[in-house]
Amino acid sequence: MSAWDTDAVKIGKNVSRGGAGPRETVVRGKSALNAAQRSGNIIATEKKYAAGNTASKPGVEGQRLTMVDRSDDIVKPKTVSKEVGAAIQKARSAIMIGDKAMTQKELATRCNSTQAIIAQYERGEGVPDQKLLGNLERVLNVKLRGSDIGKPKFEKKEKK
């Protein structure tokens, strides 16, 4: 027998793996899952993130959720920075309603949110929501995203 055994070499796309071992299959339905469990096969479940309706939910973070799902250690959730919280506080206190500064509750009603979420954002603990950040930028006239956080969104025009 030579070093090059031509009988054992199989090249091509139609070459089967051989053996009668169990193949990997996708189970669709509860009855097929129960049958696989009864047979004693190894069952692995994987969640398919952002499958069909990604256009309707642009905020879905599929890659991050997969990374969180596969990691063994605790992954800290994304939050807004303390700098954003300080900018929100400063801009909110600068806006006067009557003779008092704007409260968190008044800001929340103008941004179509709750006072608790505004408080989380001001502490720097809130989960970033682009829609809410856009509303806050519009109401407070302050940039909360990008490089120049805290700067006025639209500069006041000087009167001539």
UniProtKB/Swiss-Prot annotation:
Regions recorded as binding DNA: 104-123
Keyword list, A-Z: Activator, DNA-binding, Transcription, Transcription regulation
Pfam families, sorted: HTH_3, MBF1
All copies of domain HTH cro/C1-type, residue ranges: 88-147
PROSITE patterns xrefs: HTH_CROC1
CC annotations in GO: nucleus
Keyword Transcription: yes
Top-level taxon: Eukaryota
GO MF assignments: DNA binding
Record bears the keyword Lipoprotein: no
Disulfide cross-links: none
Family indicated by similarity: Belongs to the MBF1 family.
Function summary: Transcriptional coactivator that stimulates GCN4-dependent transcriptional activity by bridging the DNA-binding region of GCN4 and TBP (SPT15), thereby recruiting TBP to GCN4-bound promoters. Involved in induction of the ribosome quality control (RQC) pathway; a pathway that degrades nascent peptide chains during problematic translation. Required to prevent stalled ribosomes from frameshifting.
Descriptive protein name: Multiprotein-bridging factor 1
Protein's organism: Neurospora crassa (strain ATCC 24698 / 74-OR23-1A / CBS 708.71 / DSM 1257 / FGSC 987)
